[in-house]
């Protein structure tokens, strides 16, 4: 069964604790932490996400899924390692190609699962050489930087391509889809080969978190 990683990006600070408890009861698999630096993308969420991680570190055992939408990847990786995340994902587009393997090795050496992410316009072929070494490939199904966007239909073919490549080369990375995911389109994304669905607005904006998570799966 597909895993659900609930994004906390759209949760207001004064509601974070109550929301976390409700999401625990609703059986979310991960808390998805969208870290933005104001450079790689326009929004800057770093301070708020650090604060959320501190809350989560004290009150929940649900694993953290850290998604770094930042230019200075190494610096931000170090900031979030203290929270013992399950997954740390960085963007292919944020690094020079010769730096990517070093970053993959660094995150692995810290005992974390490592993910590489691509924007909607990035060709899957750009990251093929790194796929044997990562645990997760995150496909942005919207433009990174803000929640509540509509899924870009053409990104589903990237999930299909990654799934086919995984099967043909006997690899075991998980495919994570992030952006514009809701009950109405989740089946199509799962059928394309996704293993983890990131959803924020679809869950947080619903009346019944557990029912929405169940329907997304």
What are these regions (language model features)?
Residues 2-7, 31-33, 64-68, 86-90, ...:
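Hydrophobic faces of well-ordered beta-strands that scaffold small-molecule active sites
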Residues 8, 88-96, 138-149, 192-213:
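Glycine-rich phosphate-binding active-site loops on the catalytic face of alpha/beta enzymes
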Residues 16, 23, 34, 80, ...:
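Conserved, mostly hydrophobic/aromatic
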Residues 18-21, 72-82, 122-134, 179-197:
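Catalytic cores of alpha/beta
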Residues 26, 59, 83, 110, ...:
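Structural motif
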Residues 31-50, 142-148:
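Glycine-rich, proline-tolerant flexible connector loops at the mouths of alpha/beta enzymes
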Residues 33, 45-103, 116:
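Glycine/small-residue-rich loop that forms an oxyanion/phosphate-binding "nest" at active or ligand-binding sites
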Residues 39, 86-172:
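Conserved anion-binding
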């Amino acid at each position: 069964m597909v895993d659900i990683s609930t994004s906390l990006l759209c949760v207001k600070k004064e509601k974070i604790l109550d929301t976390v408890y409700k999401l625990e009861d609703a059986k979310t698999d991960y808390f998805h932490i969208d870290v933005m630096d104001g450079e790689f993308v326009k929004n800057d969420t770093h301070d708020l996400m650090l604060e959320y991680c501190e809350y989560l570190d004290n009150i929940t055992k649900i694993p953290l899924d850290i998604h770094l939408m930042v230019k200075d990847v190494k610096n931000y990786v170090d900031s979030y390692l203290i929270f013992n995340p399950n997954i740390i994902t960085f963007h292919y587009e944020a690094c020079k190609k010769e730096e990517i393997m070093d970053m993959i090795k660094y995150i692995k050496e810290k005992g974390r699962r490592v993910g590489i992410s691509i924007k909607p316009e990035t060709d899957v072929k750009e990251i093929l050489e790194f796929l044997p070494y990562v645990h997760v490939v995150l496909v942005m199904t919207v433009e990174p930087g803000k929640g509540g966007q509509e899924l870009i239909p053409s990104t589903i073919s990237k999930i299909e391509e990654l799934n086919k490549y995984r099967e043909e080369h006997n690899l075991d990375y998980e495919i994570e889809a992030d952006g514009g995911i809701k009950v109405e389109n989740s089946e199509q994304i799962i059928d394309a080969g996704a293993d983890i669905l990131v959803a924020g607005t679809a869950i947080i904006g619903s009346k019944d978190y557990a029912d929405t998570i169940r329907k997304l799966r």
